[in-house]
Amino acid sequence: EQNMADDKLYSRLGQMNMGGIGTAVNLPKAKRYFEKAAKLDNPDALYVLGKLFLRKDSEYYDPNKAVDCLLQAAQKGHEFSAYALGKLFLKGDEVPKNVGCALQWLEEAVVKENQYAEYLLGKTLLMGVDTEQDMERGVQLLTASAGQKNCCAQYTLGKAYLEGVLLPQNIPESIRLLTESADGGFTPAQYLLGKLLYRGEIVMRDIGRALLYLEQASEKENAYAAYLAGKIRLTEEGFKDVPKAVRLFQIAAAQQNSFAEFQLGLLYLRGKDVARDEREAIRWLALSAEHGNSYAARLLHSIKSGQNWSAALGALRLLQHLSRMIQNRLEDERKGTAGMTERKLKRKIDEKKQAHGLRQG
């Protein structure tokens, strides 16, 4: 009983020193307390030590020691250690990849309804990556994880139902799951849902809600969301806010988004919505061109060679319009062949199952 009390006390002291609870953060001291608790077979302490040994920004980084600690904890039934081992062995970045071992430990965690293990194993089985594809079980596990409010699982399932390739397309269920994920703060879901709401092709168009999600994703520096939100703030009547558009473009441009850089260049070049600044315009256009934007390169060439940049811009608008027409046509053709693509994918999956003796009836 004394040992039990001691191991919990040491573990608590370790948490206080690691998290700065009631004292200054002291990682070496925290490590010593966790090691004392681990020697008394405290699985939580072993887990924390394992995670500490995986911190690349720490002087204690040692994947082998991490695996040793996590194994000890997982063998004592610690579900998060089992999940951590499964993830480590599946990725194969810090320890040698071992899919069999990974699946074994993920299954151990799934038995205890660990939402993270349900998500990772479910996604692995749904995609058929590194293991035999099992879409039925993959969906089952992802659904269980999503039911525990796991944003990654909600997003993965929602996207699969949206695309209609791995799973039959189900737009209402897709939007429901993506909304739950976005409302849970998952950035990719916020961007995707915002884009869908803005386009209004498969759900009713709602620019206000679209902006809400896109700007939430922008706050977490999602470049695509920031660029799209910037375009809306720049062009959409009733939502126009040029200073906010500039800030959003700057968020995207900070991550080398060439379209945002191009928009900033245009804004400063035209001097319509912001004060004209040719030097600043050239700086942004040069960055955009450097990052692969051919329109920026052409406009920059026109400016530097003394040509009429306004006429050049008009020509670029025509090129962009033609480009959009071609893109829309290709998209229409893609949608027309979606059913064929699904049938081909299903046939390949059936052939794969037949090869493994798994095809039914």
Predicted regions, residues:
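Canonical positions in the second alpha-helix
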Residues: 36-37, 72-73, 108-109, 144-145, ...
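Eukaryotic tandem repeat interaction scaffolds
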Residues: 152, 171-176, 180-259
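Structural signature of tandem alpha-helical TPR/SEL1-like repeats
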Residues: 24-33, 59-69, 96-105, 132-141, ...
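Hydrophobic face of amphipathic alpha-helices that form TPR/SEL1-like repeat modules
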Residues: 12-19, 48-55, 84-91, 120-127, ...
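Short helix-capping/linker turns of helical repeat alpha-solenoids
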Residues: 3-6, 19-21, 40-42, 55-57, ...
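Helical anchoring/docking segments at protein termini
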Residues: 320-361
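TPR/TPR-like (Sel1-like) alpha-helical repeat modules
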Residues: 276-294, 301-308, 314-324
